[in-house]
């Protein structure tokens, strides 16, 4: 009998799409952090982002995840604004 190659906890389409949103947000945050001129600030922000995403990794509630993505996007926009002001 052939066994399935899928892991026992395969993601639904909705979960898969939400996961992609989270990963994209994480990548965008790390890209923005790379533009921080000060090495210690850059390391602090990178560690902060990593810990925040790790801390919320086990979240499964759809509304909670959506809210965290929204908050993450707002924080990313704030970081990008701050970096733009620092460059000008």
Curated annotation (Swiss-Prot):
Q: Which UniProt keywords apply?
A: Mitochondrion, Transit peptide
- Transit pept. (range): 1-19
Compartments annotated for it: namely:
Mitochondrion
Q: List the disulfide bonds.
A: none
Its GO biological process annotations read:
mitochondrial respiratory chain complex I assembly
TM region(s), chain numbering? none
Keyword set includes Mitochondrion: yes
Cellular component annotations (GO), alphabetically ordered: mitochondrion
Q: Which Pfam families match?
A: Complex1_LYR
Q: What does this protein do?
A: Involved in efficient integration of the N-module into mitochondrial respiratory chain complex I.
Per the similarity annotation, which family is this?
A: Belongs to the complex I LYR family.
The identity of this protein, by name, is: LYR motif-containing protein 2
To which species is this protein native? Answer: Bos taurus
Its gene name is LYRM2
């Amino acid at each position: 009998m052939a066994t399935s190659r899928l892991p026992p906890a395969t993601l639904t389409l909705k979960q898969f799409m939400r996961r992609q949103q989270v990963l994209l947000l994480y990548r965008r945050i790390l890209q923005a952090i790379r533009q921080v001129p000060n090495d210690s600030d850059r390391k602090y922000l990178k560690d902060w982002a990593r810990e925040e995403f790790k801390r919320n990794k086990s979240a499964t509630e759809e509304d909670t995840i959506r809210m965290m993505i929204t908050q993450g996007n707002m924080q990313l926009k704030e970081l990008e604004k701050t970096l733009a002001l620092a460059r000008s």
